[in-house]
Amino acid sequence: MASSTQGQVITCKAAVAWEANKPMTIEDVQVAPPQAGEVRVKILFTALCHTDHYTWSGKDPEGLFPCILGHEAAGIVESVGEGVTEVQPGDHVIPCYQAECRECKFCKSGKTNLCGKVRAATGVGVMMNDRKSRFSINGKPIYHFMGTSTFSQYTVVHDVSVAKINPQAPLDKVCLLGCGVSTGLGAVWNTAKVEAGSIVAIFGLGTVGLAVAEGAKSAGASRIIGIDIDSKKFDVAKNFGVTEFVNPKDHDKPIQQVIVDLTDGGVDYSFECIGNVSVMRSALECCHKGWGTSVIVGVAASGQEISTRPFQLVTGRVWKGTAFGGFKSRSQVPWLVEKYLNKEIKVDEYVTHSMNLTDINKAFDLLHEGGCLRCVLATDK
């Protein structure tokens, strides 16, 4: 059914980042109607992720200001542009920063979940059709972010970047499947393919690290070692499947040696969930000679490089990376939502705080406190 606002500019509230590292402000933003191949979504709930903060901090070379950040959200389709067939007004959806067009070289390869169709536009804060933004304030364009821009009551996304989900799913919970939880689960299931009986090490016990633990537990890992410099995280991590804990601050030896000693030669799989290149090296080097695999999940700052001795790889270790946990967004996010509804995966347990969009700056402060996993913001208050 067509909405009353179809084809019209909508004025709504959005959190605008005018410049790097300056508090966001709630503004009245004009959101243009969707063009061909685009979808306008009423965002109901959006969560905060460290990737949003990374761009807001000014360290992201692709960061453009002013912009509307946010990429972990859920909402309802308000209207669709010409040629859009897979979603319609009223559908419940999760915007996906990882597109899936099913037509490009990447999508057709069968080897990756990456998609090349809209990246050239989303990487510079615009839409594909006309290389312009759908957001403006008094005629001044406001850039998009990651093709999602969910810190707004309404957003416009490409149709290849939105997953239709079961309307029974609570949007204030399944919004987390738009990034962090899916990334951690998929790193285990899709990228590493952890087998039953494996020994796993997880560096960094934030939302993504805990989702890795959850995935490893469901895969039947025999030992799941959580590594973090904040010992307060350990009690929470037990609930997600972590079986033992190591705080690097408690040891004089390099952390990789501590883990090798604990595991009779090293772990079968390790996951770096921080984005620290020196920890990435530790994660690789704590893997067992001959077969250990380390997966880089955390996003390092631009320009940083990883290093290790080639001998580490020559002797059988494997170093891999993952984006969105290897999940194909439009095809598999709905499947993850069903797994949640069937109580096969945790999601609610990652939500430690609930606030309103107007409290977004306070929410970002919380993100850096040890007790916060995910803070979910309601946009309609």
UniProtKB/Swiss-Prot annotation:
It is an enzyme of class 1 (oxidoreductase). The keyword NAD applies. Binds 2 Zn(2+) ions per subunit. An alcohol binds at T51, H71. The keyword Metal-binding applies. It is found in: Cytoplasm. PANTHER family: ALCOHOL DEHYDROGENASE, ALCOHOL DEHYDROGENASE CLASS-3. Homodimer. This is Alcohol dehydrogenase class-3.
